[in-house]
Design a protein with these regions (language model features):
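Conserved "right-hand" nucleotidyltransferase catalytic core of DNA-directed polymerases
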Residues: 1-55, 122, 133-135, 142-355, ...
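Conserved RNase H-like, two-metal-ion catalytic cores of nucleic-acid enzymes
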Residues: 1-129, 133, 234, 351-356, ...
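Buried hydrophobic packing segments
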Residues: 93, 114-117, 181-185, 260, ...
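Amphipathic alpha-helical segments within well-ordered protein domains
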Residues: 189, 211-212, 413, 417, ...
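Short, leucine-enriched amphipathic alpha-helices that occur as contiguous helical runs
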Residues: 204-207, 423-427
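Structured ligand/cofactor/substrate-binding pocket environments in proteins
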Residues: 370-407
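Generic long, charged, amphipathic alpha-helical segments
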Residues: 406-424
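Short, amphipathic alpha-helical "recognition" segments used to contact nucleic acids or chromatin
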Residues: 425-435
Length: 437
């Protein structure tokens, strides 16, 4: 049924999955939550095999156990496996059988990880974009777009409805994805060799199994405690809102400038205006005010953000069986630093002396283990200063000398002093520029 012997003779095997993943956009991939299912698997090899194996369409599927056995044979063969968005496909493949797992001894590559190593400023790493760049080809989607539109309406999304179609409509589309991935990889590796960055590509590729393990294991969270804290902070926010409303003699919406204006007018407190003459109450302005109205507004906003962004959205809505399964993205920033999503565990509050400890205590280490916090000190500023100083830029030379003389030199404060703005604003702008804003 399957050309297993020919597949085993291949050097490279490209793999792509089609899925039913209903909550992908709101909660991230559903494989780890068992939320949705694997619809089919396409492969392409460097010796001519290119096929699609449907197992989760509404009709027309192959025998699921036989497809699983085929994939187990492929993974046991220790061939070089090629993906476009490997972590997504590997997560879903493990729902078919947890033995379909890669480790540090596996040869796994992701063309969407290789490409930023070749051109970190491109920022467009979809399979379609890479196919256009390297192959002068585009994914053939006209037929499947038409079929999805005819069956499910003009606004229906292809990826969300593929699994509902008979595999005969999906086969060509899925096979093309696997083929294009393989062909792009070949072109990329020629450039990798030319640019002499094989070691970097190997290093980043070896992170794929580690990041998959991190994703699947997740982080323990105290769900019950989170729900209790959410209620407590809600009550505290409501009390602050009552105090603000009482001072203003009217209900105040702390997110609407027109409403905030009434509170300041009631207390005869002066405020700033925009260039167009409308009242302005920026966060930076509020933070330097000493009046009770400003303090109330800041408190309400802070409590609202803590409750909804961190407790509700990050824990209460994302936790699965007492764990949250964050996605880490190895090439999420142009500097090579990880980014994270669903939820972003890199943005857990740390500075607020009252609320930050309460939020961080909701994230639990494994039994009989402790958390360890390690961080590079201003790594992007140091790299920037190094390369800028090679151009003999005066301010960069000064910054370089400052770093050499004092390891605690604060780059963001230097920029803040130069621009005459608060350090917090300088840091936000600096990091945005470093990460590709």
């Amino acid at each position: 049924m399957f050309p297993i012997e020919k597949i085993k003779e291949a050097k490279y095997i490209s793999i792509d999955t089609e899925t039913c993943d209903p909550n992908l956009k709101t909660h991230g991939p559903g494989g780890v939550r068992n939320d949705g299912h694997l619809a089919g698997i396409s492969i392409a090899t460097d010796n001519g095999v290119n096929d699609y194996y449907p197992i989760g369409h509404q009709t027309g599927n192959l025998n699921k156990e036989k497809v699983k056995d085929l994939m187990l044979e492929i993974f046991k063969s220790k061939k070089t496996l090629i993906f476009a968005n490997a972590l997504y496909d590997l997560e879903w493949l493990m729902t078919l059988d947890n033995k379909l797992k890669v480790d540090q001894n596996s040869w796994v590559y992701d063309i969407q990880i290789i490409e930023p190593l070749l051109d970190e400023n491109n920022r467009k790493y979809s399979l379609n974009n890479l196919s256009q760049k390297y192959l002068r080809e585009e994914k053939y989607e006209d037929q499947i777009n038409m079929e999805v539109s005819n069956r499910f309406g003009k606004r229906a999304k292809v990826k969300e409805n593929l699994w509902k179609l008979h595999p005969s409509y999906v086969k060509g589309y899925a096979m093309e994805d696997a083929r294009l991935t393989l062909e792009v990889f070949k072109k990329q590796m020629a450039r990798v060799k030319s640019d002499k960055i094989e070691d970097i590509v190997e290093f980043e590729s070896k992170l794929i199994p580690l990041l998959l393990d991190t994703r699947l294991k997740g982080v323990r969270v105290a769900q019950d405690r989170a729900e209790t804290l959410y209620i407590e902070l809600k009550q505290k926010q409501e009390l602050s809102q009552k105090i603000l409303n009482k001072r203003a003699s009217t209900d105040i919406n702390v997110w609407a400038n027109a409403s905030i204006k009434r509170a300041y007018d009631k207390e005869s407190i002066k405020y700033t205006y925009t260039d167009k003459g409308t009242p302005s109450f920026t966060q930076a302005w509020l933070e330097v005010q000493k009046d009770p109205i400003s303090e109330c507004i800041l408190e309400i906003r802070k409590l609202d953000k803590i409750r909804n962004t961190f407790i509700k959205n990050m824990i209460m809505e994302k936790a699965t069986k007492g764990r949250i399964h964050c996605q880490f993205h190895a090439t999420g920033t142009v500097t090579g630093r990880f980014s994270a999503s669903n939820p972003n565990l890199q943005q857990v509050p740390a500075r607020d002396q009252e609320l930050a400890p309460l939020i961080r205590d909701l994230f639990l280490p494994e039994e009989e283990e402790d958390w360890v916090c390690a961080d590079y000190a201003q790594q992007e500023p140091r790299v920037l200063v190094h390369y800028a100083s090679l151009k003999n830029i005066d301010s960069a030379l000064t910054a370089r000398d400052n770093y050499h003389q004092d390891e605690n030199t604060d780059f963001h404060q230097m920029v803040a002093d130069m621009a005459e703005i608060p350090r917090k604003q300088a840091k936000t702008i600096n990091l945005g520029l470093f990460y590709g804003m």
